[in-house]
Amino acid sequence: MVNATVNGTPIALPEGSKVIEAVFASGNYVPTLCGLEGISDIGACRVCVVEIEGVERLVPACNTPLEDGMVIHTDTPRVLETRRVNVSLLLSQHDVQCATCVRNGNCVLQDLAQELNILDVPYEKEPTFTPWDESFPLIRDSSKCVRCLRCVQVCHKVQGCDVWDIKNRATRLDVGVRDGLSIEEAGCTLCGQCITHCPTGALRARDDIDAVLEALADQDVVCAVQVAPAVRTSWGETLDLPRELATEGRLAATFRALGFDYVFDTNFGADMTIMEEGSELLERLGGKGTMPMFTSCCPGWVRYLKIKHPDKLAHLSSAKSPQQMFGALLKEYVGLKLGMVPPRQGAHELAGVREGAGLGIGVSTNPVGTGANDDASVAAAGETSAAASGPMGKRIFNVSCMPCVAKKYEAAVEEMVRETEPDVDAVLTVRELGRLIRLMHVNVAALDETPFDDPMNEGSGAAVIFGATGGVMEAALRSAYFLVNGTNPDPDAFVEVRGLDGWKEKSFDLGGHEVRVAVASGLANAEKLLAAIEAGEVEYDFVEVMACPGGCAGGGGQPIHEARELAGDRGQTLYALDRKRATRFSHESPNVTTCYEECLGEPLSHKAHELLHTDQEQWTL
């Protein structure tokens, strides 16, 4: 053990500890700006400086090793003045337009200026402005960069992408896209982890609120919104709502208060993804297709493969993500059921919806996947009535609320735009949702809870856990077991794929056939897994990868909390919701069975492939 004293308080810590650990362990405090626990301790900002008796210069607490007998002072006049000077210098190079910054009120630099009582900056203002393509889903404002290098560290150590790099040195130190490339050329996966770890507004997601507001105000548009599983765990954080108020029902009511005509649950899309992806897995296990099969619902992961390992794209499931499956079904199936005609040629022929069909309530008498409703029988079910009730002829504007930045890219991929109309028109992150609620002055706490709209309102528990790492794998195995055996497994039979470990592996028996699975979150972990597969060190049948550590619960579009990682807590909320669901299997969802009965026939049918599958090799970056 190493013994030291911090502001008069003795402390003993293991060898190898840093001064900052001693400070916090002793109940004292030092501010930080560039530091990220376990990721970055480069001491670039010099905000965490402390005074050590016998040492002439001040030292950064974050990366100075703790030595036996150290006497540390965190708040001497010299220390405080040095911090004030260092933060003032940062402010002199910062475009201090706080009122119009997305991080206003949630900015480390802003907090430091207030904490240190900096009322004026006595240095010449020298913010730097670098041009940026603001149509790209990720925006960098160089005038707000404080050169903390967090983005460089996270992109390298956590994601292994190395998009950001140091430019110049010493007093001319700057950060930018590596090798002088544009962001489009540098291989950015749009995971957004640099955004959630940036201490200021230098990095943000493209804001699409104005496009949504324009649609909401258009009388010729029907606005529908779909809500991803992980959003329900975090949306209240943007408004400082306690979890008991930030319920699913109040979330649905909030979207209605914002003016949306329909509020749907992306859990329906997740259940459909499981049916298609699980069926595809069984096909591949039977020798049809490249093995192992990789999940395909994370666009950050798809971008990573396209950029780093284009030779591995055949391993991806062809199933679209829940967002995109939902979008396709909304505009081609549900839109017709509700009396809206999508502006696409052949839409009536594409969706064989029965005339006078209900809104998907009730369970089909034919089990999904039995072949009882093949393409021919569905086509014979009758064409949609042109006189169906509803806002006939109005255009559907489909908004998705996601915990993800890469979803903005995915929605705009040419493969997801049929005719001239995208399946998903706009994507809002959870942070944008919070800003939209404030903009529209919605008093969320005063709203009564309401359900999501039919026919996409009742997702299974399997769909809910999509938002946690391992959730897609667990949900797929639940239904794959049923498709093989005709009976349900214990819904908790596959919980061993849960957890925040970066790379997990397990084998399960699916009716006499052993299935070897792996789960990875964080792209640096995914790279290690790919290398092991390539080297023949491991063999798997099914691999789930989520670009963000912890999965969508830790997504790049989630609320930002300085020095706190909440993916684990949010994941636990999703597991609790799963346990409370009346239906915990995707194949038992009433809306899923009705959709196959009325529209698709069975998983992997021709119609299902046309609507719910894609070829990622054709995606443009």
Residue ranges of predicted features:
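Helix-enriched interaction subdomains in cytosolic or periplasmic regions
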Residues: 182-206, 306-310, 427
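Short structural boundary motif marking the start of a folded domain
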Residues: 1-4
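Iron-sulfur-associated redox domains of electron-transfer enzymes in respiratory
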Residues: 15-69, 75, 79, 206-621
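Mobile "lid/hinge" segments at catalytic clefts and subdomain interfaces of large enzymes
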Residues: 162, 195, 433-434
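Fe-S ferredoxin-like electron-transfer domains
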Residues: 46-190, 203-222
